[in-house]
Amino acid sequence: MALPGQQAVDYPSFKLVIVGDGGTGKTTFVKRHLTGEFEKKYEPTIGVEVHPLDFFTNCGKIRFYCWDTAGQEKFGGLRDGYYIHGQCAIIMFDVTARLTYKNVPTWHRDLCRVCENIPIVLCGNKVDVKNRQVKAKQVTFHRKKNLQYYEISAKSNYNFEKPFLYLARKLAGDPNLHFVESPALAPPEVQIDLAAQQQHEAELAAAASQPLPDDDDETFD
């Protein structure tokens, strides 16, 4: 039986909830996938837009029904109806705004209260912007909660597919699953400084080998 906002399809489909503070780029991220943007449906009872995002894997086609909050989070927490039946999730923060990272634990708690034991990806968005405030070494929450973390840039399409590939592998129980063709994405609006971002990725890898902070508060220099 299809869930609200989902038509029945004859290939695997999953409800993906995307959460995070307002302005972190969740809608921009989802809208990069042109087919999903064209076929989106608005669910007025819950106040969300549902974008069907198709990906083609070596095991066949899969679909993520991406639930986008349409900005509701700016007026307080999200209703449980947004989370119910969620099968996977992305928590997004903005690397240029520290508060959005500090609020990640709250989003994670709200998500896990309704959706138990689902695969979750933490995404640090806007890595194309020069004045980064959340440094790679300061991102430790994913290690504490055993989440996958990716640095992304929605406007440049940098790492767009990685969260979806990780979730697809987890949901399929197949670590060798891979995408056999790229989805149609909107053209990049900005260019990312790849050399600078590779340096951030190296710092992230180095930080992963360091002991975790003792307290729950993320430290900012």
From Swiss-Prot:
Protein name: GTP-binding nuclear protein Ran-A1
PROSITE patterns, per database record: RAN
Residues covered by the Small GTPase Ran-type domain: 10-174
Comp. bias (Low complexity): 199-208
Gene designation: RAN-A1
The organism's taxonomic lineage, starting at the top: Eukaryota, Viridiplantae, Streptophyta, Embryophyta, Tracheophyta
Xref: Pfam families: Ras (PF00071)
UniProt keyword Transcription regulation, yes or no: no
Gene3D superfamilies hit by this protein: P-loop containing nucleotide triphosphate hydrolases
NCBIfam families reported for this sequence: small_GTP
Cited function: GTP-binding protein involved in nucleocytoplasmic transport. Required for the import of protein into the nucleus and also for RNA export. Involved in chromatin condensation and control of cell cycle.
Region (Disordered): 199-221
